A protein has these predicted regions:
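The feature marks helicase ATPase cores and/or their adjacent C-terminal helical subdomains
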Residues: 1-157
Length: 157
């Protein structure tokens, strides 16, 4: 335990968080995440889509590559760049089962904070976990998925 504390002492960020939303609560939750990051003094924020920019759940609210005042682009376009906070959107069952490398590219762009937004429910979390080698879906699939990703979980329904 002491050794773990020594290793973690130099890390400024928080444990990543996955936000489980419905389509109806998605934008309010996204706005809350952005407000929380700003409240914590983080202004270098980017929203990265695990899909394409045009297929993203937030595409209709994006104008000229910006959501509100926040930069928005695909993970592929942001490869090699960094931001203090990254909000990954369009996290789906496919991300877990087929796009792990793309997820890594997006997640590893965050210097301090990583927030993940998804509309996955218990059933889609269970399906993803069952298709992932070594993963097990218990009675609480959303929590189990968050645990597999080493994230905390927040539900916005």
């Amino acid at each position: 335990e002491c050794r773990r504390a020594e290793v973690l002492r130099g890390i400024a960020g928080k444990i990543p968080c996955i936000h489980f939303c419905s389509k109806e609560t998605y934008f309010n939750a996204l706005d809350d995440v952005i407000s929380g990051l700003r409240r914590d003094g983080i202004d270098d924020i980017v929203i990265l889509s695990l899909s394409t920019e045009t297929d993203s759940i937030v595409s209709g609210a994006v104008k000229n590559g910006v959501y509100g005042e926040i930069r928005f682009m695909s993970c592929r376009k942001f490869k090699g760049l960094e931001a203090d906070a990254v909000i990954l959107v369009d996290f789906t069952e496919r991300t877990v089962t087929d796009d792990a490398m793309l997820f890594y590219v997006g997640a590893s762009r965050a210097r301090i904070r990583l927030e993940i937004m998804t509309v996955m429910d218990n059933e889609s979390c269970r399906n993803a976990l069952e298709r992932t080698e070594g993963a097990c879906a218990g009675r609480r699939p959303m929590r189990d998925l968050a645990s597999m990703l080493k994230c905390t979980a927040l539900v916005h329904y």
